[in-house]
């Protein structure tokens, strides 16, 4: 299966479509995605960044890098967020390829350490991530797993 991974800055014309795609997957307000993506295009700082896996023009996967993914440990930053692969494309290495691309891209931008929150217990280890600690999500009753990736 052929697909291409891009930073949104390489295809700014799909910003609105990308914001809607993430909004539909995660139910975070559309405007929050749009604002973060617009900020990423200004290139004033390495964070935020948004990445997409594209099969032709279809978005089949994506993720972002933001300062804080809605948790109380503001010192654990930046965070990979909104990791999602369309169901028809799971188990084809899309998320792993996105993670590798994001880690390399952020390292080129001077950021060696990334964090992410997940409920998954074995997926991210395959890609060099390590369990770091439990964190309290904003408004969440349960603690969540925080992973770290050191470049």
Please provide the spans of the model-predicted regions:
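Short amphipathic alpha-helix that is part of the acyltransferase structural core
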Residues: 1-37, 45, 50, 54, ...
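Short hydrophobic/aromatic beta-strand or adjacent loop that forms the aromatic wall/cage
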Residues: 48, 141-146
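Conserved beta-strand in the GNAT
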Residues: 52, 58-68, 79, 84
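Short coil/turn motifs at secondary-structure junctions
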Residues: 68-70, 88, 121
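Conserved acetyl-CoA-binding loop-helix of GNAT-fold acetyltransferases
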Residues: 85, 91-104
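Conserved active-site alpha-helix within GNAT-family acetyltransferase domains
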Residues: 108, 112, 118-142
